[in-house]
Amino acid sequence: ATGNVWAKDGYLVIIKTGCKYNCYILGKNKYCNSECKEVGAGYGYCYAFGCWCEGLPESIPTWPLPDKTCGTK
């Protein structure tokens, strides 16, 4: 706990497509961890083939996006 009361957890989402960041090595995952940290999260790992971030800033959108489902234009 960093004492940041505004943090949330969630799947990282690609804003353009509404898709999750895909990952294949479940659990501890370097790619997810670095992508999550890139947007200010505490850490990230691969859960159900998507990058899950813990301790995300409130301002970072997470999956699912209200107006975009992955795969539809």
From Swiss-Prot:
Pfam family, any one: Toxin_3
Entry similarity comment: Belongs to the long (4 C-C) scorpion toxin superfamily. Sodium channel inhibitor family. Beta subfamily.
Sequence ranges assigned to domain LCN-type CS-alpha/beta in this UniProt record: 8-71
Entry-linked SMART domains: Knot1
Record's GO cellular component terms: extracellular region
One example GO MF annotation: toxin activity
Protein name: Neurotoxin Cex13
One biological process term in Gene Ontology: defense response
Gene3D superfamilies: Knottin, scorpion toxin-like
Localization of this protein: Secreted
Keywords of this entry: Amidation, Disulfide bond, Ion channel impairing toxin, Neurotoxin, Secreted, Signal, Toxin, Voltage-gated sodium channel impairing toxin
Main location: secreted
UniProt-listed CDD domains: neurotoxins_LC_scorpion (cd23106)
Propeptide, chain numbering: 71-73
Disulfide bonds: 19-70, 23-46, 32-51, 36-53
Keyword Disulfide bond: yes
Domain notes: Has the structural arrangement of an alpha-helix connected to antiparallel beta-sheets by disulfide bonds (CS-alpha/beta).
PROSITE patterns from the UniProt entry: LCN_CSAB
Modified residues (Cysteine amide): 70
Tissue specificity comment: Expressed by the venom gland.
Function summary: Beta toxins bind voltage-independently at site-4 of sodium channels (Nav) and shift the voltage of activation toward more negative potentials thereby affecting sodium channel activation and promoting spontaneous and repetitive firing.
Leader peptide range in chain numbering: 1-7
Domain of life: Eukaryota
